């Protein structure tokens, strides 16, 4: 393990030049203190988690100090927001401190969110509030624990610095880790500003840093785009399988590595609702749960357009056509496992669609249904779960087909079935009301609940004694929390 002052930085993105980012120093927050830290994320930097409790740690990630070899940069990019193109966005409140290599040879971007104003703040104050910082921290680490690709969050640093949103709140900073912070919007920016040299330089950087295997292909940029399509298809399949609704799938929030990025008004489904809208600001439901699949393809098409100086239109169109089949294959594979199947049958998709429609009509808890489905034999589970459905006759008919399908699957050992299903069906997810309870306590200076919730969510598949309340259905008030883009 390293001491904090032993971290060494590389700044390869900064070396691309001022056309790509601006040099900005963090603006410190008043009286910085640790709210919560992720030992697993800190380990990616070879840091001892015990260091998080030191004042030096709070001052470093509260903007008061800086490593000598760090070169903080605010990145410039553009993007399509709710379907419309915005010519210039960029890091309006966050700074890329640089890259750190760990003992395993991995490189991790360190990005300090809430670090103050930048040239891209667009009239904003450059700050992040404690509320949104806690939500990003919890979501990042919860998704990782669910095996859903995501940026990581190493810590949240709180402060006494006042900021105004709908009311006065307090500023905080999040240390975000990711192999890259390059977004679809980076390529869009140089495409729409007609700067092909910078576009090519960015492409060369991404190939060398993140897709070196594509350099061996006859058409490296096309191979890179195919990888991006495949990764995003798999990512969104996992979102859909686990009921995660991102809320703001603008192209500036889409990662070229296919990881979940930029957490705002996200939510996990409580009751299954294919039309669920988690973003209170999304009046038209563009980013509803069911729309995430086509929006993912639409976003990839905007990236494809931006890559036309590097790749032929015909090749881009053909590669983009792989998205839906790839999504469907990944999604069905995940859902078969969630249903306890070890084999594939042609009618599995129909069986799944019938189940989801029954769940939608009855308001069945999405996470708990699948968890309970694996608690007992198929026959016993179906008999126990039927009372959750309004259309009992319809569920009974589905249950007969499901039990027959399980029998054909041939995996008869119940203990093995239980272990197999529990390994993919979480007991604990980040429900909005749990996050809100942790935020309410933290805003009063009590960080124990956010730390406890983080610990529970770090091990979502294993039953944790004494933590039964974290696996319950939400109270009625918890189902109707309005989350907006305000952060």
Swiss-Prot record:
The keyword Magnesium applies. Keywords: ATP-binding, Magnesium, Manganese, Metal-binding, Nucleotide-binding, Nucleotidyltransferase, Transferase. The active site is at residue 252. Mg(2+) binds at residues 253, 262. InterPro entries: SelO. ATP binds at residues 90, 92-93, 113, 125-126, 176, 183, 262. It catalyses: L-seryl-[protein] + ATP = 3-O-(5'-adenylyl)-L-seryl-[protein] + diphosphate; L-threonyl-[protein] + ATP = 3-O-(5'-adenylyl)-L-threonyl-[protein] + diphosphate; L-tyrosyl-[protein] + ATP = O-(5'-adenylyl)-L-tyrosyl-[protein] + diphosphate; L-histidyl-[protein] + UTP = N(tele)-(5'-uridylyl)-L-histidyl-[protein] + diphosphate. It comes from the Bacteria. The keyword Cell membrane does not apply. Pfam families: SelO (PF02696). GO terms for molecular function: AMPylase activity; ATP binding; magnesium ion binding. Its EC number is 2.7.7.-, 2.7.7.108. Its cofactor is Mg(2+); Mn(2+). Nucleotidyltransferase involved in the post-translational modification of proteins. It can catalyze the addition of adenosine monophosphate (AMP) or uridine monophosphate (UMP) to a protein, resulting in modifications known as AMPylation and UMPylation. Belongs to the SELO family. This is Protein nucleotidyltransferase YdiU. It comes from Pseudomonas fluorescens (strain Pf0-1).
């Amino acid at each position: 393990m390293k001491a904090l002052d032993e971290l060494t930085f590389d700044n390869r993105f900064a070396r691309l030049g001022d056309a790509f980012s601006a040099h900005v120093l963090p603006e410190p927050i008043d009286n910085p203190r640790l709210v919560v830290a992720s030992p697993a994320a800190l380990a990616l930097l070879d840091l001892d988690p015990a260091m998080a409790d030191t004042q030096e740690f709070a001052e470093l990630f509260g903007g008061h100090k800086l490593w000598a070899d760090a070169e903080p940069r605010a990145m410039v990019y553009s993007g399509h927001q709710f379907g419309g193109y915005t010519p210039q966005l960029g890091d309006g409140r966050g700074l890329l401190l640089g890259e750190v290599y760990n003992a395993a040879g991995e490189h991790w971007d360190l990005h300090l969110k809430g670090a103050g104003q930048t040239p891209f703040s667009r009239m904003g104050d450059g700050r992040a509030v404690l509320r949104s910082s806690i939500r990003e921290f919890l979501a990042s680490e919860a998704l990782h624990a669910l095996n859903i690709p995501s940026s990581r969050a190493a810590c949240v640093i709180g402060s006494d610095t006042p900021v105004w949103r709908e009311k006065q709140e307090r500023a905080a900073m999040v240390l975000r880790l990711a192999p890259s912070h390059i977004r679809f919007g980076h390529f869009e920016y140089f495409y729409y500003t007609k700067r092909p040299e910078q576009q090519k330089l960015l492409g060369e950087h991404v190939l060398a840093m993140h897709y070196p295997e594509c350099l061996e292909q006859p058409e490296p940029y096309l191979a890179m785009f195919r990888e991006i399509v495949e990764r995003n298809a798999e990512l969104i399949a996992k979102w859909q399988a686990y009921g995660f609704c991102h809320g703001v799938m603008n192209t500036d929030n889409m990662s070229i590595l296919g990881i979940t990025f930029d957490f705002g008004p996200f939510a996990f489904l409580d009751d299954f609702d294919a039309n669920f809208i988690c973003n209170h600001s999304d009046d038209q439901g563009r980013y509803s749960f069911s729309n995430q699949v086509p929006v993912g393809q639409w976003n990839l098409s905007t990236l494809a357009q931006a890559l036309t100086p590097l790749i032929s239109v015909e090749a881009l169109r053909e590669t983009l056509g792989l998205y839906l089949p790839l999504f469907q294959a990944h999604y069905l594979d995940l859902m078969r496992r969630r249903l306890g199947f070890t084999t594939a049958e042609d009618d599995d998709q129909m069986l799944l669609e019938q189940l989801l429609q029954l769940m939608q009509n009855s308001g069945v808890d999405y996470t708990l249904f699948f968890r309970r489905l694996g608690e007992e034999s198929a026959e016993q589970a179906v008999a126990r779960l039927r009372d959750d459905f309004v259309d009992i006759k319809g569920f009974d008919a589905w249950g007969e087909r499901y039990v027959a399908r399980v029998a054909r699957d041939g995996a008869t050992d119940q203990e093995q079935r239980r272990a197999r299903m529990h390994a993919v069906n979480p007991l604990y997810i980040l429900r909005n009301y749990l996050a809100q309870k942790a935020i309410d306590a933290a805003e009063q200076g009590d960080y124990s609940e956010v730390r406890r919730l983080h610990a529970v969510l770090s091990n979502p598949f294993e039953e944790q004694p004494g933590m039964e309340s974290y696996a319950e259905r939400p109270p009625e008030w918890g189902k109707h929390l309005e989350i907006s883009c305000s952060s």
